[in-house]
Amino acid sequence: MDGDIAAALPPVNQQSKADGTAVAAAAAAAACHGDFEPSVWGDFFVTYTSPPSLSQEPEEQMRERANFLKGEVRKKFEAAAAMSAINSAMLVDAVVHLGIDHCFREEIATALRSVHKEEGEFGSCDDLHTVAVRFLVLRQHGLWVSADVFDKFRDDTGSLSKSLLCSNPRGLLSLYNAAHMVTPEEKVLDDAIAFARSHLEAMIGELRSPMVEQVSRSLDIPLPRFSRRLESMHYIAEYGQEEGHDAQILELARLEFELVRSLHLRELREICRWWRELYNDVKLPYARDRIVEIYFWACGVIHEEEMSRARMIFAKTFAFTSLIDDTCDVHATLEEVQKFNEAMQSWEEDAVSIVPEYLRTLYSRTIKGFQEFEDMLEPNEKYSMSYVKKAYKLLLQYYLKEATWANENHTPSFKEHVQVSIISSGLPMLVPVLLMGTGLATREAFEWADSAPDMVLASGEVGRFLNDMASYKLGKNKKDVANAHECYMKEYGATGEEAFAFIANMTENAWRKINQACMEMDPAMLPAFKVAVVDLSRSMEIIYLGGKRDAYTFGSNLKDLVTSLFLKPCA
């Protein structure tokens, strides 16, 4: 099967096979000329048909079996609750990890209330893995639990005990991941992260599958910051190798994964056709041709079957924004950016007359596209479009601000750069887009997001700083405004590596602010913002890999992940 897929795939750009130095050099050269790598995929997904062996059995039979298994898993929640809170915590962790938690929202909420309440049962537990899993699942669902639960694993000096922990890779990995639910000023978890990381790095060469793969992934991107969809893809292949795994839960996870992937492939075909028509219509050859990567990104944020509308709105909004961003960054003059922005602020079709001629089709298609999004909404949801338009207009204003800086060759202060660039990252704009598309948010939630709360701004910081770290490593477009590293270096006389370390630390702090906000938020609003902020921020980690790559600009960096997610059989 893998050989058949490989034969069908478009050839990999040779740059993706080069060593790191060559990749960086090619990236810098391409960026300096505004000459982006062509699409890795072309029209592959427009004509792609799943081979019969990938479909396995008729979809109707798969759904019938999945529905039966859901009933069986609900019984397991009841049985776990009757046994102990520890059993409930382990079951929740498995279901979440395998990506089927959306099937059991009520059961998980009930289980977590018990897990949160039964502190005594966990207080007497001396298994690091169990204690860490409880800490992780509670904090991920907005329930506060003190880091004091790890005190029992410290020695008389207050340090984590090497004798207790260093021969326990599973416990160390769970501690490492759980500790990344840290909030600002929780210094007690900093040493847990450092301790676990150093010992995991030391022992990784001795670990066996699947532990070695799990440790490797988490050392790159900790589990609470990793894409839920990608993690479930990996864990489905690994869970069956774990002692005590549940065969019915694993079967359900495989069925759900394949059913959802079938929908994703249909959506991907549709959006690739939409994009090809749009790209050919607007005639902006300097812009990145990245619709497959955009849709992959959308699935990393919202993969659930019932979220098809949200995925398509997100992906199409992203596509319009990418065309505009590339226009402002690599092609348009300042006057052209000003005219385009002026028209967008009016949001009127007849304002197209003031737009530069070569951008008029882009302007008209963007206005028409957002009207189509509004037409997809229910009557009681249409108010949400006003929040989306407001955020989009703000984004365009900040694009203009950056274009002005670039035109004047102005290097802003680091603080000023951050204030502008977290908005121009596009993430704060995508928050109301996701709230609108998912239908999970109330008017109060839109109002809160519109007030620019720390949680939303922190998401923008994650996206901007990861992007800027990648730009520092790979090179940036010659027309781009100075990035965060350059602003910091100029203002503080720092070296590039010092600036990189400082900005990496700011990215870490942004994640901590997001964690804190999740635990302070009104529980009724949390589900909407876990998607619109947490999962959106997670997707940035995948694209930029901690600032080590820019897999959107250089789509060949994502080819293996796209292939695994959409084309390879579920293990």
Curated annotation (Swiss-Prot):
Induction: Accumulates strongly following fungal elicitation (e.g. Fusarium spp., C.heterostrophus, F.verticillioides, R.microsporus and A.parasiticus). GO terms for molecular function: magnesium ion binding; terpene synthase activity. A motif (DDXXD motif) lies at residues 325-329. Substrate binds at residues 325, 329, 464, 467. Mg(2+) 2 binds at residues 325, 329. Pathway: Secondary metabolite biosynthesis; terpenoid biosynthesis. It is an enzyme of class 4 (lyase). Keywords: Cytoplasm, Lyase, Magnesium, Manganese, Metal-binding. Mg(2+) 1 binds at residues 325, 329. Binds 3 Mg(2+) or Mn(2+) ions per subunit. It catalyses: (2E,6E)-farnesyl diphosphate = (+)-beta-selinene + diphosphate. It comes from the Eukaryota. Pfam families: Terpene_synth, Terpene_synth_C. Belongs to the terpene synthase family. This is Beta-selinene synthase. It comes from Zea mays (Maize). The gene is TPS21.
